[in-house]
């Protein structure tokens, strides 16, 4: 009962405490996402990375005459019809508990092969988190590279076992080859899922609804449906459950037995596994809904004089939203009892790479926390409600942007476009660091811009020059950009308005049914 025992150990570990990246013994007043669950959620989310232009064009050509969207991010991530058996897969590469790579399958390469190309021998002793169990072709190469551990989501594998009967035999043979590679390799190939700590889902729901992006919509569109967030979340839940879960229990058991997890097919292990998976999907859908594809909202430059120039350099909105959700997930590892902040840095190379992320590649990420190696009682945890400024936390917390820069896995190249996504407006302490590091663009909320609070101020962000700032707001040009129209409508990141005579949002599938 090796796998079942492993699940028991993980459950007891998850129920006890969450091991922190920064301070290993931190047990705060708020529920906290474990590292294992964070990496797992990020791998699932990377599977949904918006498809690059070539994939978008092909899928649109197959639609022949159907204008408008193929759906939200998750719809764009579906594999082409001639490759249904090979599922798109997300991958998180972790070294010494730090994320050093975020990848997803491309049209030509699986996620494991992309990791090998990108990291090479540096994969030695790394932990890899896949959104699906990798195929034998990928596994033999990453095992050969000397990885430490390979974790995967225990549902339909990369070579789908849910495909047509004509191809199921090949899928079963591949699954057997994977098991032989697993049993004869030094790498630990396993399922790492921890139950969420008590009240975690409730906490994520409350904080997602109260986050800057949702509240900005609620304040600027008072006539909007007050329940738009709940409707958006319910749609996401349905879509993600279809993509990442196996609804039929017997079919799920068949898959588990085929991929070597027969010990998890007995209760209570099977029911616990399915519940843990469902809880994580609910959490992912909740966080993803906090940066919604809603009406004309997105990340735009507020300066109307620079709009045309800035748009020529901006990311497509679907990619900007995806990266911001990455940062939102990171924020749930915070060590700040009052507010969690997450930050992620990406860069865009001169040409498209083999990765499913296109020309974009991961630089680093972080969240606000106390210095590495410190214990829970080493520093004050009081906020500005404490009158004695000496025992407040603000002098000791390392900000999310600072951690992302400190623990970056690649250098920032001045000739490339590097961008940082932050869940809150960067403060006066971080703004000069971001500019000094050579980051070209900032994507953030602007709720706190120009404010000066008791221990922290946000005055410099509005005055910042030389760095493009894209904040969450209504499209200031007054034109709704049709994100899923013909491929020419978004070329090299250029957002172009539709012809005036064309119906805005034609066949548009929003997160909301009505708006």
How would you describe each model-predicted region?
Residues 1-515:
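Zinc-dependent deaminase catalytic domain
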